[in-house]
A protein has these predicted regions:
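Extracellular/periplasmic helix-loop-helix junction of adjacent transmembrane segments
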Residues: 45-77
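Central cavity-lining transmembrane alpha-helices of secondary-active solute carriers
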Residues: 67-86, 105-107, 295-308
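C-terminal transmembrane helical hairpin of 12-TM major facilitator-type secondary transporters
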Residues: 318-365
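Glycine-rich segments within core transmembrane alpha-helices of 12-TM secondary carriers
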Residues: 161-185, 387-398
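C-terminal ends and interior cores of transmembrane alpha-helices
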Residues: 102-120, 326-342
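Cytoplasmic membrane-interface "Motif A"-like loop-to-helix N-cap segments
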Residues: 90-102, 314-326
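Extracytoplasmic gate region of multi-pass secondary transporters
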Residues: 42-43, 246-301, 394-398
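Multi-pass alpha-helical transporter architecture, strongest
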Residues: 212-219, 421-440
Length: 440
């Protein structure tokens, strides 16, 4: 028995090591594509798809049908987390990350190549829905694997910093998505954009996918999983084990992510919609001006992500996140309504910068916190499942609820809604144990 343990330790010590630069690129590239895709699809679903993928008729009905395809990805993501989590916990992190990125990449590029309703009729929206489902499926396995790639390759005292690498992909992807639409608005007429220009961002994502595949194929398996595989300790059905033996931490992990998702979708989708909608319903600001504001604010998001990782390594995940979540509640109740509601571009810019900086602070530690909640044999499935179920509870409904609350009760109730979601996260954090010194 002692000889076996010695052999396993020797195998782990002699296992090939991934360089930090390779881990950084391989882990953040998928998240960058995820957020790049989120924004280009959300924009196209409102501006383009109702006109080219759905029968001509009631414009409102066409828009709702288009937005329904956007929601398909949220349904597909938990399925993807179970599917890719199964193979990630049984076969390995590396091969599963390659498969999830390939699934996501093919589906995204396919959207940019789809024929329109005018060309192939009812098949066009059906193929769009299928491609969107494929995107969600790939996305469901992407983040958890990327977070594990980072944290399972990290030195023990720097796990939160390494875990912030995949989180950096979010501001990078969002920045490039906004930049792409700004560039297209300068170079193309509205007619050119509606005819073929909208396809460019989807097809361009192939470049990011190829870079990601090149780096990921050359990776070695993480030392933590290599040890489990050598000992043949993989479980047969990771999702079954997760939902029978680790229900409490799965639920807590889901609610820990809730404030992050709600904050991001309110700061981006809702804020863009409210800011550009003509007064008196919205602020009536020019679309390009709001895009510029978001691009500048996203820089604050990106800066805060690694800072949050460093803070979580220094003070612990739980204490850091409790403070940050409390700040989100204060922002939602006392800063959000007066700054956004002012209609003053400078104050709206301040609102976006503060809100997205808080987003960086709350999102940064998640790359370490969620994986550390689960044992190695179900870590891929557990981290992915919590992350993606939370996207349904937080991300998928946040813009709709915020818009409805603002229209019926006023902007301050949007802040109360955000504060309530953050309060649920705060409760989950208080019920969670500290994981900083936990061995993976």
């Amino acid at each position: 028995m002692q000889a076996t343990a010695t052999t396993l330790n020797s195998e782990q010590e002699n296992a090939p090591v991934n360089s930090r630069n390779k881990v950084v690129v391989a882990s953040l590239i998928g998240t960058a594509i995820e957020f790049f895709d989120f924004y280009i699809y959300a924009t196209a679903a409102v501006i383009v798809f109702p006109h080219i993928f759905f029968p001509q008729g009631d414009p409102t009905a066409a828009t709702l049908q288009s937005l329904a395809t956007f929601a398909i990805a949220f349904v597909a993501r938990p399925i993807g987390s179970a599917l890719f989590g199964h193979f990630g916990d049984r076969v390995g992190r590396k091969v599963t990350l390659v498969a999830s990125l390939l699934t996501m990449g093919i589906s995204t590029v396919a959207i940019g190549l789809l024929p329109t309703y005018e060309t192939i009729g009812i098949l066009a929206p059906l193929l769009l829905a299928l491609a969107r489902f494929g995107q969600g499926l790939g996305l469901g396995g992407e983040w958890g694997g990327a977070a594990l790639l980072a944290t399972e390759n990290a030195p023990p005292r720097k796990r939160a910093l390494y875990g912030s690498f995949p989180q950096l992909g979010a501001p990078i992807g969002f920045f490039f998505a906004n930049g792409t639409f700004l560039l297209l608005s300068w170079l193309l007429t509205d007619e050119q954009f509606m005819t073929w220009g909208w396809r460019i961002p989807f097809i361009f994502s192939a470049v990011l996918v190829l870079i990601g595949l090149y780096v990921r194929v050359s990776l070695h398996e993480t030392p933590v999983f290599a040890k489990v595989a050598a000992a043949k300790k993989q479980v047969k059905i990771p999702l079954g084990t997760l939902l029978t033996k680790h229900v409490r931490v799965t639920v807590l992990g889901t609610f820990i992510m809730l404030a992050t998702y709600t904050l991001f979708y309110i700061m981006t989708v809702y804020s863009m919609t409210f800011s550009t909608t003509p007064a008196p319903v919205g602020l009536g600001l020019p679309r390009n001006e709001v895009l510029w504001m978001l691009m500048m604010a996203v820089i604050g998001f990106g800066v805060m992500v690694p800072i949050a990782g460093l803070l979580a390594d220094r003070f612990g995940r739980r204490p850091s996140m409790i403070v940050i979540t409390s700040l989100i509640i204060l922002f939602a109740l006392f800063v959000f309504p007066p700054l956004l509601g002012s209609g003053n571009p400078a104050l709206v810019m301040a609102y976006l910068l503060i809100g997205l900086s808080l987003m960086g602070l709350t999102f940064g530690p998640m790359g370490a916190l969620l994986p550390e909640l689960f044992p190695t044999e179900v870590r891929y499935t557990g981290a992915s499942f919590s992350y993606n179920v939370s996207s349904i509870l937080g991300a998928s409904v946040a813009p709709y609820i915020a818009t409805w609350l603002q229209a019926n009760y006023g902007l301050q109730y949007v802040g109360i809604y955000l504060a309530a979601m953050a309060a649920l996260t705060l409760i989950a954090l208080l019920l969670t144990h500290e994981t900083r010194h936990q061995s993976l």
